[in-house]
Amino acid sequence: MSETINTAAQFPSFEKPTVQFNEKGWGPCELPDTFKDVPYQPFSKNDRLGKICDWTSTSNNDKKYQNKYASTFGTGNQYAYYHEEDETTFHLVDTARVQKPPHQRGRFRNMRNSRSGRGRNARGGLNTHGHGMTTLNSKNVKARDPRRGVGKRFGNRGPPPKMRESSVAVRADWASIEEMDFPRLMKLSLPNIKEGEDITTCGTLEYYDKTYDRINVKNEKPLQKIDRIVHTVTTTDDPVIRRLSKTIGNVFATDAILATIMCSTRSNYSWDIVIEKVGEKIFMDKRDHTEFDLLTVNETSVEPPTDDDSSCNSPRNLAIEATFINHNFSQQVLKTGDQEAKYKFEEPNPFISEDEDIQVASVGYRYKKWELGSDIVLVARCEHDGVLQTPSGEPQFLSIKALNEWDSKLANGVEWRQKLDTQRGAVLANELRNNACKLAKWTVQAVLAGSDQLKLGYVSRINPRDHSRHVILGTQQFKPHEFATQINLSMDNAWGILRCIIDLVMKQKDGKYLIMKDPNKPIIRLYDIPDNTFDSDDSDDGEGDDGEGFQQVYNYANNSNKI
């Protein structure tokens, strides 16, 4: 009997699977439902396995060895473990200090002192008198007490910041036009400004006495009071600038005004400058009978002088003293006398008449112009204090200034009599910290005038409590451009600040404006003020024969009773 065998039932049939074709990338186009919402983290077969959670991820608290198991994989945080504290077991603990019985107080004091190595007559100044009592020497008590309040100076626990007064009271009818903060001004730059071109020169200069270069601490010399007149004439009262303004330039100022604006980012005290815009011309002036010409002392110090008017070390009294020292020093180091040679410029001193018989300070005035671009031509009056005869016979013009030491302990400085001869760089570095603005302005004035050298004198009080007698301890000279680089003074930035002020005023209508440094913030404000502002202050000033009012001159030798 034959049987028919069905072979089709013994072998399964082959069904062709559906292969997805991904035209836009690599891998499947759709994800099966069984693998949805399952987190995925790239891994490498070289990764360490056998851990419950990924301790090598970014949540690892071991910052020192955070790259211990690092690789290109394992950087995800899908399986990272985050420790969360269980607050159900939180409870308060009594932290009140337990009062010890009297017999246990000071029990471990001697053990602690002996462990730190401060035994009897040890270096730390601890003396043990027995019976568990340890005292400090009186010398070390004084050294320790100032350190007690160091931690209180930080944060809001320290004393409130010192509020300075404004140089001029802002009135209600003044309109604020612009506020310029120091960080923005410090980013300005106006490069490639050429050296100023001389227009005319006036005055007479005396020659420098080289014997003052040999003065040192052991060979000091008393500072003399020179009875000479020093003119501090503002821009619009200068007859030469009035004459030049008719034909040359459209911005007019003095070197002191320009230096104040160009070094404004280094100033802390308040100051102001009046600007008059007449057509396309700008005149920058200082107000009469103000402290604009006084030299600041320790303006940029961490601990500036205290505001005690009754003290000789108040900011104003120190400024008068510094101005007195500066003018007398600049005249004392010159060869004076009728028999001594003098250097005469093209024109005589424009601030004295021929019939006046007065002793005028040795000052040479150089009127120069600069082209600042965009048809802006600056005309300014610059000054030289002396002249030096070189071996080749060519004269070198000097800017002579003086730094003064008043009280090194109160000024947080260094003792000049101990450091000046051996570590003069340390003394100058300390002055750069405490008087950065004043030194920068002196440097800018020397650069603007084209001085060949900047002479700095070191003048100190004979007694720190006596502000009327001083001695010269030494001198030092620099080239203005090199000294500007040394004190990190950028002339490109200085020209940029000046050009920014000029552009702001040029955009305004004709009238009177005022630039003021905020007394407590690093901000300069530009105000639009009425045309008759400050006119009442000038009504009492004397006028010359030609009707041109001059600012009162100052005789610092006769005003010595003020300091």
Curated annotation (Swiss-Prot):
It comes from Drosophila mojavensis. GO terms for molecular function: mRNA cap binding; translation initiation factor activity. Keywords: Cytoplasm, Initiation factor, Phosphoprotein, Protein biosynthesis, RNA-binding. Its main location: cytoplasm. The gene is eIF3d1. The modification Phosphothreonine is found at residue 128. Residues 98-167 are annotated as: Disordered. InterPro entries: eIF3d (IPR007783). Pfam families: eIF-3_zeta. GO terms for biological process: cap-dependent translational initiation; formation of cytoplasmic translation initiation complex; regulation of translational initiation. It is found in: Cytoplasm. This is Eukaryotic translation initiation factor 3 subunit D-1.
